[in-house]
A protein has these predicted regions:
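Short, surface-exposed terminal/edge motifs of secreted or surface/virion proteins that either
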Residues: 1, 60-72
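Noncatalytic modules at the cell exterior or secretory-pathway interfaces
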Residues: 49, 98-108
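Short, flexible beta-strand-to-coil junctions
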Residues: 52-62, 125
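Terminal beta-strand-rich extracellular "head" domains
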Residues: 71-89
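Short, structured beta-strand segments at or near domain termini in extracellular proteins/domains
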Residues: 110-125
């Protein structure tokens, strides 16, 4: 998983397909405490080689892209596929840690930062 350029660059990259624009805000721990694994049911994202999330931190600062490389293991549910609610809005791997400087990093486990991030859009290819 790698961090790349600011969110607005992703609209210029035609190799990515838009999956959804959830605009859902996640707080510390949401990925696991409030979610369920949906990898098996979500074939579009499960079968994608790469998934990209455009996120912003508290108040919309520091837009960041998180790119998740799923080429090595598409069967894994841990750190690859969780949901942020019991509804139908699913996203591939994300617990978010917001660092002290306000930037967002994707992580398998949320750190004890107590901040929140907003997932603005999800792309795949």
């Amino acid at each position: 998983m790698s961090i790349s350029q600011a969110c607005n660059t992703l609209y210029n990259d035609l190799t990515w397909k838009l999956y959804s624009t959830p605009n859902v805000t996640l707080k510390n721990g949401d990925g696991y405490s409030g979610g369920t694994s949906v990898c098996g049911a979500n074939s579009t994202l499960k079968n994608a080689n790469y998934v990209k999330l455009c996120i912003t931190n508290n108040g919309g600062r520091n837009p960041t892209e998180i790119v998740i490389d799923r080429t090595s293991d598409k069967s894994s549910t841990h750190c690859n596929c969780v949901s942020w609610s019991a509804a139908t809005a699913y996203f591939v791997q994300l617990s978010l840690a917001v660092l002290a400087d306000g930037s967002c990093n994707g992580a398998c486990n949320v750190g004890g930062w107590g901040f929140k991030c907003t997932v603005k859009s999800i792309y795949y290819r």
